[in-house]
């Protein structure tokens, strides 16, 4: 029985995709114990992964060094006597906790002069490990099986039926089939399909007999209101009114989910919802929704993907030229 300490990623979608690594470890050793270090927001997601024993909160913000905090956490974990540590992020600071915890075997990709902190450093061959999920999963495999990993398991989050019932009552949701819209893009506006287009999609969905839920965080509230404006009782703006764990349960009920390339898109994929992923500045070849039940919407313009937070050409044609009719036609006819 091996005992693993995983240093998880900092983004919602990446943490969902990391479940493929956790499942891989369990497939290779069903008695394996897996604990995951992550940001505070990640605990509810990790609690829905049956492979994970404990989520360990790292009380530092994204981008903060927090060396003393990492040292203190590492020292507190020494009594766990972990056999292996897998450090998913490539930053120097990400490898500190396993080092201070005196984990015997510490593996991660080469980067930021981590020679002492890691005692197995893997080369990141981007031509072979050409997807995020491949990179994560490869770290849980022997070197000879890692380039690339084969038969990668798909994320599958647990759903809480009691919480689903509570959410329906709390938000007075309809019994109509639901389409979830996720219009936020935490990374930047270059990943965001226009809000006016989401409004047109919502209008058509309601006319076709659906209810529409707009999901997102507090920052998305105003956009959510714009999407449901004048659409009546079957359009509900839930942005900022639910927790991340609630989004898991709501998306599991929704018949379809239409989303920018975002963390919520990956959650929808991990609960089996039919996913319509909108791409432009990013690529579905690198971070696809990990499900067979998906449709990708991407114009594949010459300037795309740029992987920039804002459009360097100042037109965002990869989003603006993907018209509502193009999406509506596919979403409502499948």
List each language-model region with its residue ranges.
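Catalytic machinery of carbohydrate-active enzymes
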Residues: 1-334
């Amino acid at each position: 029985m091996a005992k693993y300490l995983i240093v998880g990623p900092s983004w919602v979608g990446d943490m969902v995709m990391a479940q493929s690594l956790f499942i891989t470890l369990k497939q290779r050793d069903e008695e394996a114990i897996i604990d995951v270090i992550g940001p505070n927001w990640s605990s509810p997601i990790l609690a829905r992964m049956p492979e994970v024993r404990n989520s360990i909160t790292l009380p530092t913000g994204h981008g903060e060094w927090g060396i003393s905090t990492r040292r203190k956490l590492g020292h507190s974990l020494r009594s766990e006597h972990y056999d292996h540590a897998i450090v998913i992020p490539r930053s120097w600071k990400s490898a500190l906790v396993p080092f201070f915890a005196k984990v015997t075997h510490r593996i991660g990709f080469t980067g930021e002069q981590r020679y002492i902190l890691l005692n197995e450093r893997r080369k990141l061959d981007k031509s072979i490990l050409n997807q995020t999920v491949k990179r994560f999963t490869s770290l849980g495999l022997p070197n000879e099986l890692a380039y690339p990993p084969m038969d990668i398991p798909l994320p599958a989050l647990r759903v809480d039926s009691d919480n689903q019932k509570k959410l329906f009552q709390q938000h007075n949701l309809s019994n109509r089939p639901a389409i979830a819209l996720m219009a936020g893009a935490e990374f930047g506006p270059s990943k965001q399909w226009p809000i006016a287009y989401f409004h047109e999609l919502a209008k058509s969905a309601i006319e076709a007999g659906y209810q529409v839920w707009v999901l997102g965080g507090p920052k998305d509230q105003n956009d959510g209101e714009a999407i449901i404006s004048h659409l009546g009782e079957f359009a509900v703006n839930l942005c900022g009114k639910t927790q991340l764990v609630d989004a898991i349960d709501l998306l599991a009920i929704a018949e379809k989910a239409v989303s920018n390339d975002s963390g919520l898109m990956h959650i929808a994929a991990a609960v089996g919802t039919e996913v319509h992923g909108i791409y432009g500045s990013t690529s579905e070849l690198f971070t696809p929704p990990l499900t067979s039940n998906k449709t990708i919407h991407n114009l594949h313009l010459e300037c795309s993907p740029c992987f920039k937070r804002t459009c360097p050409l100042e037109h965002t044609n990869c989003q603006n030229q993907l018209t509502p009719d193009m999406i509506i036609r596919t979403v409502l006819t499948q």
